[in-house]
Amino acid sequence: MLSLIVRFCTKYMSIGVVLIGIFSIFWPEVMKPFAPKIPTLLGIIMFGMGMSLTPGDFKNVFKQPKNVAIGTVLQFIIMPAAAFALIHLFALPPEIAIGVVLVGCCPGGTASNVISYIAKADVALSVSMTMVNTIFAPFVTPFLVWLIAGAWVNIDFMSMMMSIVKMVLLPLLIGVGINYFFPRQVKKVNTIMPMFSALVVIITVGCVVSLSGRTILDNGLVILAVVILHNLCGMLLGNFCARRFGLNKAQTRAMTIEVGMQNSGLASTLALMYFTAAGGIAGAIFSVWHNVSGSLFASYCVGKDEEAEKETKISSAVELK
């Protein structure tokens, strides 16, 4: 029964996000009180991610060091560069532009690992990239935000770095430690973490919308266009670079997904903490869109594999005749 509830919540998360968004525009006072709790909720998600990691995941980093390094560098070059280009191309106002920058400068999100599994990508590489990107995030994310946006908004580098350490790195490492010492108990908790993560995303989106409903109504379509282009830039350039570096099919799929999908929950949280609620809009929309685009890409990959399998069977049958 519990597994069915978890599957339902994760499967229909995107619908839940849209519904809470509409609800929060008309009744903003309901979700506003949850806003101060978002950093804590994000920390619990990262704690859950840590509990899902095993010693084998860390070993995989050393099995594919070159590919993990390529993915990490691409993650922190392509998405920030795409954000920089898009905010200038669309001439976004600073309060909205900072949200796009935050999305671009954050590490990959854990949803990428699920999408990689569905797409029959290299899941071990995907998990390794997410893990390494997340560990580097406290230092790289504030620096990139300062580099891109420091000229037009005030960036408190040290404070942002410490916030990411507290919300992301420490919970992650504590989760890893608990999983190492108490693996049996952790297995039970891990079954409900996907549902909890989905609920936190829904709450975060509700808070962002409740605090910036007017801005969304005035600029929503433009922000949606920027978010879609941002995600597509990441996936297309990630795919192109992976091919150029000679990665195989499964690795290329993992790189495509990993570079294009971001920890948008962290982006929205940082926007609410350090800038304005309007800065969280891009992250809120990205939370929905990257799951849609990721699922579409996974379906495309599965379809391609099925076609290739059919062609192989036909060729084999012809040869036998």
Region locations from a protein language model:
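Alpha-helical transmembrane segments of multi-pass small-molecule/ion transporters
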Residues: M1-K321
